[in-house]
Amino acid sequence: MDKKTTQLHHYHLSQEAKFIDFGDWSMPFSYEGTLKEHNIVRTSSGFFDVSHMGRLEIQYSQIEKISNLICSELIDIPTNKALYSIFTNEEGNALDDVIFWKFEDKIILIPNASNLDKIKSHLTTHNVEYIDKSEDTVLIAVQGPDTIDLIQDRFEIPDKFSTNHTENYLYARTGYTGEDGVEIMANNEDTESLLTFLTEKGIKPCGLGSRDTLRLEASLPLYGFELTEDITPVEASLSWTLTNKNDYLGSERINKQLSSENHKVLKKFIIDSRKIARTETVGIAGETKGLVTSGNFSPILNLSLIHI
């Protein structure tokens, strides 16, 4: 079966991107090399096509229903704020980690690409109405310390983890790299204009290879590795997301884990080596003590990082 491509695929081809299969998608892995793109984001500004991720529009009237399904408090956060949270199942395990953009009259929910259908089904099961905007829009993440200065003549920049909008764009000051920046949602017909603006500002395209090294360097989780349907937010060291004080799906088990140390937990380590640790068990004296969930080389530290 042919892989899906985003609205920006023609641009990636024109830039001679190297592609990688990412679930059902064919996505750019790199353009000029992962190391160079990593350093671009750490020192100036780069942009990522993340349109493989979902964009679900939900009316404000549905907010209470959603709040019963996630581990964070969504109702009480101010309008024009962004929220990172986790959908949990009946056992308290993670169905997906997501971003919410809260506007005056609606919410934009951004699930991971591999979990979009699962989250849509989950919302339908719990009578949450939504409009899937994923095929009608693009999502571009512009990241790096120079980003705000470069784009502020077109975008009125909100505070960190806040949202804003123009006539053509919805956006939030969020990201997945550990750097400052914005993530921009645009209708398909506005894609070329946005690309032209970014490239004329000298902002370079970056692929998923550097996005992974950047997120690992920033100790950010990746669904399917640090989070799965067998791992709770507590076990993934994401207890800081547990701001929902109500009874939400799986909250009973999660609350028990909060008052106990008898559960697995995610830890982050630096290896004094350039060797990249792959997914494998970690043992002491022949006894398995853990599992490497992610491992990669840190270009900034010149060492390898792992999550166990």
What are these regions (language model features)?
Residues 1-88, 93, 209, 301:
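Acidic, proline/glycine-enriched N-terminal capping motif
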Residues 41-48, 95-103, 127-133, 167-177, ...:
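Short, flexible, solvent-exposed loop/turn segments with mixed acidic/basic and small polar residues
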Residues 50-54, 96-97, 105-107, 137-138, ...:
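Short, surface-exposed beta-edge/turn micro-motifs
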Residues 63, 99-222:
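Acidic, low-complexity central loop/insert segments
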Residues 72, 78-83, 116, 155-164, ...:
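Glycine-centered loop/turn motifs
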Residues 85-87, 130, 280-286:
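Short conserved beta-strand and strand-loop elements enriched in small hydrophobics
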Residues 172, 179-181, 208-213, 217-254:
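Active-site-adjacent "lid" and substrate-binding segments of diverse enzymatic cores
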Residues 231-237, 241-306:
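Glycine-rich, small/acidic residue-mixed loop/short-helix segments
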